[in-house]
Amino acid sequence: MKILHVAHFFYPCLSAGGVVNASYQIASKQSKDNDVKVISSDSCKERLKFPNGRYDVDVRGIKVDYFRNISNRFKLATMLDTPLFAPFKIRKDIKKYEIVHIHEHRQTLAVIVSYFARRNNIPYIVQAHGSVLPFFQKEGLKNLFDKVFGFRILRNASCVFALTEVEKEQYLKMGVEEDKIEIVPLGINLEEYENLPSYGRFRSKFNVGSDEKLILFIGRIHEIKGLDLLIDTFNDLIHNGNDGSIKLAIVGPDDGYLSKLDEKIKECSIEDNVIVTGPLYNEEKHEALVDCDLFVMPSKYESFTTSGLEAMACSKPLVLTKNNHIHDWVDGNVGMACEDNKDSLREAIEKVLFDEKLSQTFGENGKKLINEKYNWDIINKQILEIYKNFI
């Protein structure tokens, strides 16, 4: 099968969030038995640079064309690409492919590719990755984009992938026909979790005792992640008879909120109990997951949490707010889901953190669910079967 993936950020720009990892994992799995190409841009916090100035490169076995943006600063400010020569190359090359898979539709490359795909009767699929509705940030710009391009891109798609039933309802609100919507979740690469690091490495590096409880957050340091709520809750937690026996580790790249986070930690005078590591990848991230007692995701909005799946792969229980669209199958099964307030979050954390039997049960259930459902081997088979319906 000849497949084209379109992603406005792509590996190695992991700081751009979970969409980069998802699009990479899907393309990587498909490349083993199919002819796969990815087109993306050179944007990241700092422009991506390539050997010998080539922008058509091999990324771990995946053929990728990175279009150079006229302005990286404009891309980061608006999330809109300004890709040099993209229309000319895409117009020429689009006929090579049997199907197109667009990751996030509010991007210039999606406009260009969807247009030429339609002109050449090539089916395309849209996977919004939690960005179906235009809200939270840059709402005015998103609404304008939708009026000019977005609605057309979604409605003309052969199929759209929803992460959850909640996202399915969002597609319906955007005018997508119900029979075009498929539920396709996110997953993890099981191979990356076959040989985990031994317990204690993260704790040793960051001075966390073996007798201390460790709560872990992994994600972008962004306002939407609910870190203000997490700090307020943790402040209450350690001053409720647990001072000195609990540590909180916050792992992830700054996405505009780090200075406010640091300020809030200082205001609460909990610097000795909170560890802010910055981004950790691969082995170092696995060390944090192995050493934690509980994974927490207090987001104000979250369609799916890949880092939560990673914690489940390490047999760790989850606590998340009901703002996360997966809360229905998490709650009482692999962790606890709570309301978006301090008292509810603290109660959920305490219930899981200090009940070892419950914590172990949640962890075992999570690991089983990863092996049975939420891994890229299974999900990729589902995606390929969907592709075949349109070729």
Model-derived features: positions:
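N-terminal subdomain of nucleotide-sugar transferases
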Residues: M1-N52, R60
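Conserved donor-binding/catalytic core segment of Leloir-type glycosyltransferases
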Residues: L4, G209-K225, I231-F234, A249
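Nucleotide-sugar donor phosphate/pyrophosphate-binding loop at the beta->alpha transition
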Residues: P123-I125, L133-N156, E169
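Glycosyltransferase donor-sugar binding loop
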Residues: I188, I218, I246-K260
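Nucleotide-activated donor-binding/catalytic signature segment of Leloir-type glycosyltransferases, i.e.
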Residues: K260-L280
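Aromatic "clamp/platform" in nucleotide-sugar-dependent glycosyltransferases that forms part
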Residues: K300
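Short hydrophobic beta-strand element within catalytic cores of glycosyltransferases
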Residues: P317-L320
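Conserved acidic donor-binding segment of nucleotide-sugar-dependent glycosyltransferases
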Residues: G332, M336-D343, K351-K357
